[in-house]
Structures are given as C-alpha cells and as structure tokens.
C-alpha cells in the first residue's frame, strides 16, 4: 500500500527541490542567517541539522558526504572551521526559524532561518528608536517644524547681502 512521505514538495520536481534546498543550505552556512518562505525554511532546517551533525564527526568521510549535498568548498570550509567549533557541545537544535509578516507582493508566509549560536541581537536598535519617540513632548512637532523653517531662512539671509554687494561694486567703476 502506498504511504505518503512527510515532506514538503515546494511545488518543484525532485531535482529542482534538491537543488533549491542545497542552495539555501549553502547560503545559510555562509551568511548564518537568511530570509525565505516559511515552508522552505522548515525544509532547509531539516537538511542543515543533518549536515551539521555529520560535520561534528570531523572525518574526511563526513566531508565527502556533506559535499554531496552542498557542493561549495568555501561553505564546507566555513562549516568545519567556524560552525562546528561553536556548536561542538550542542546535541541538535542548531537552527532557529522565526516567522515574519507576509511578503508584500504575494502574501507568502515569510520566515528567517538562522544558526542559533551565531544569532546577533538586532532587536536592540529598534528599542532605542522607540524610546526616543516616546520621550517626545506634546507640541514638539510644531516647534521642530518652525525651527526647521527658521534654520533655512537664517542660512539664506546672509547669502542675500553678499550677492547684493557684488553687483553694486561692479556698477560703480564704469565711467565714460
């Protein structure tokens, strides 16, 4: 009896799906964080988890097995030198999938997939911006707008007398 395998087809043929997942895995290893659709991120997570587990063995055989999936020497070098060194004691769970808002063009569910030990804290910068906005005093927009209008007027005012002096100086020496 036919049984269904629990995997996403991603709307591709088997060869195209394998190539897509290979490419996404390579980019994840090189960049440590990529943004893609949610389905591709979840499938990439499966592939990358297995690759990193093989890489932790550190043998030549493991390198050759991984090269079947990745096919990029720079990515394999990064995997064995940087990533395995950081995740050496971790037993699985090397990646994280974070869901994002839908893509603007086609409303596809988007996600970020990243290596856990290489995650940076991008949330620190937006919090600082929010604090600056919340400290704004009522009516300060009007004062900022009037100050912005006054500043260009103040800068433009000194230029006008300088230009008016030059034509007068040129007009005076003409005698016939």
UniProtKB/Swiss-Prot annotation:
Q: Does the keyword Lyase apply?
A: no
Region Disordered: list its residue ranges: 124-176
Where along the chain is composition biased (Low complexity)?
145-176
Q: Which GO terms describe its biological process?
A: translation
- Assigned keywords, A-Z: Ribonucleoprotein, Ribosomal protein
Q: Which GO terms describe its molecular function?
A: structural constituent of ribosome
Upper lineage is: Bacteria, Pseudomonadati, Chlorobiota, Chlorobiia, Chlorobiales
* InterPro entries named in the record: Ribosomal_bL17 (IPR000456), Ribosomal_bL17_CS (IPR047859), Ribosomal_bL17_sf (IPR036373)
Instruction: Please indicate if the UniProt record lists Ribosomal protein as a keyword.
Output: yes
Cellular component terms per the entry's GO annotation:
cytosolic large ribosomal subunit
Similarity field: Belongs to the bacterial ribosomal protein bL17 family.
Pfam families the UniProt entry points to: Ribosomal_L17 (PF01196)
Name of the molecule in the record = Large ribosomal subunit protein bL17
Coiled-coil segments: none
């Amino acid at each position: 009896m036919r049984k269904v395998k629990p995997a996403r087809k991603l709307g591709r043929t088997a060869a195209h799906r394998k190539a897509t997942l290979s490419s996404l895995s390579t980019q994840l290893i090189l960049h440590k964080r990529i943004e893609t659709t949610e389905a591709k991120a979840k499938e990439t997570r499966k592939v990358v988890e297995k690759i990193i587990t093989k890489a932790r063995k550190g043998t030549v055989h493991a390198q050759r097995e991984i090269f079947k999936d990745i096919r990029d020497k720079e990515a394999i070098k990064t995997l064995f030198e940087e990533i395995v060194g950081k995740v050496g004691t971790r037993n699985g769970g090397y990646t994280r999938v974070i869901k994002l808002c839908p893509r603007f063009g086609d409303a596809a569910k988007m996600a970020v997939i990243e290596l856990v030990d290489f995650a940076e804290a991008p949330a620190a910068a937006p919090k600082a911006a929010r604090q600056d906005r919340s400290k704004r005093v009522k009516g300060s927009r009007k004062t900022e707008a009037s100050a912005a209008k006054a500043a260009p007027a103040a800068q433009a005012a000194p230029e006008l007398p300088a230009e008016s002096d030059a034509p007068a100086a040129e007009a005076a020496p003409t005698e016939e």
